[in-house]
Structures are given as C-alpha cells and as structure tokens.
Amino acid sequence: MFKLIEKNTWKRKPYFDHYFGQIRCTYSITVNIDISVVMSFKNKNRTKLYPLLIYVLTKAVNNHEEFRTAINDKGELGVWDTLLPCYTVFHEENETFSNIWTVWNDDLMTFLSNYERDMEMFGGNYGIDAKPDTPANTFPVSSLPWTTFTGFNLNIFADGSYLLPIFTLSLIHI
C-alpha cells in the first residue's frame, strides 16, 4: 500500500524541497559492513549467502520509512508500507542477468523459502524480467561477485524522481 505524504505538514518538507527542487542531485555511498553473523548463520544452516544478504537489506529498508519514500506513477509523494526486493540473477551460460522479485516476509525461513521457490520457478528464465509482473513497490539489489570495489556509483538517467535505495554488492572477502 502506498500512503500519500501531506507535504505541507511533513517535517521533512524543507529538506525535500531543498534537495529535490533547488539543488537537484543524486547520492551514492559505499559502506563496508561486517557480515560475520550472517556468515556464521550461513555455515551453520548451510544456506546460500546471496538470499541472506537480500533478506538483511530488505529488513533494513523496511525498518526505515526514509528508504520507502517514493514518488508513484501519478507523481505523488508517499511511503510504501512494505518494499519487496528485486534482485539480479546471473546466467553463466550466456553472461547475462535477469531480475526476480520475491514477496517479503519478516520471518527469515519463510523469506528463504519464498526465494528458493522463485529461483526454482524463474531462475532459468532469460530476459530482463525473469519473473513477470514486477510490482511498483520493489527496490533493486544486484551483485558483482567477481570483483571487489570500494566505491560504486549508479546514475539513473531520468527526471530525477527515483528515490528508493539501490544496492550493489561486491565480492566478499572473509
């Protein structure tokens, strides 16, 4: 569900107007995070790392209204109650990737089950959207697991109204 923001009473209005209207710009930040707890869980439970990281990112995004603030297809400012991850899946056979989205569930094991089901059903599909009907309340997660980087900047060439976070993961050194 997308809840409209009443801009005139919104506490962030002056900041939004300043950065969205006066000095239009984009932001990019690269953060190194400690995933030792995630790795411990992965090894103990024999799960895959990528879906665990997608879960952690989605949980963080859904815990912060600022990350769920968006402009809908009607040009209205609002907040999604929940965002779903839309992540890339690499196809080694032809060196392309596809997007798959997964229904969010705060319970880790349920989310991992949803992820595995989506991978079984859509992971072998080629083309940009392996799973059809991507909902509007998704945010992108991708991975470049063959390279390490300490900075990454993705510029969306559009009208500048895309506000949701975009995550790109690199090779992980343990």
Predicted segments — roles?
Residues 1-22, 79-84:
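Short amphipathic alpha-helices and their capping loops
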Residues 38-63:
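Acyl activation and transfer enzymes in specialized metabolism, enriched
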Residues 67-100:
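Small-residue-rich loop/turn and linker elements
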Residues 25-39:
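Short amphipathic alpha-helix starts
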